[in-house]
């Protein structure tokens, strides 16, 4: 994910990883942001 205004938090709707906030990635099956298993950028 990326640190930008309007980024989606956990379980926020998304279409690509960059829709999500840092350390979150877009879950391909459910189309929401989920933790990408990282602890740092």
Swiss-Prot record:
The keyword Secreted applies. The keyword Methyltransferase does not apply. Keywords: Calcium channel impairing toxin, Disulfide bond, Ion channel impairing toxin, Knottin, Neurotoxin, Secreted, Toxin, Voltage-gated calcium channel impairing toxin, Voltage-gated sodium channel impairing toxin. InterPro entries: Huwentoxin-1. Signal peptide: none annotated. Its main location: secreted. One of its GO terms (molecular function) is toxin activity. Disulfide bonds join 7-21, 14-26, 20-33. Pfam families: Toxin_12. Transmembrane segments: none annotated. One of its GO terms (cellular component) is extracellular region. It is found in: Secreted. Expressed by the venom gland. The presence of a 'disulfide through disulfide knot' structurally defines this protein as a knottin. Toxin that blocks vertebrate P/Q-type (Cav2.1/CACNA1A) and R-type (Cav2.3/CACNA1E) voltage-gated calcium channels. Also inhibits sodium channels (Nav) in bovine chromaffin cells by delaying sodium channel inactivation. Belongs to the neurotoxin 10 (Hwtx-1) family. 56 (SNX-482) subfamily. This is Omega-theraphotoxin-Hg1a. It comes from Hysterocrates gigas.
């Amino acid at each position: 994910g990326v640190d930008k205004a309007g980024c989606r938090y956990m379980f926020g709707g998304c279409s690509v990883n960059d829709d999500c906030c840092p350390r979150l990635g877009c879950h391909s099956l459910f189309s929401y942001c989920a933790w990408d298993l990282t602890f740092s950028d």
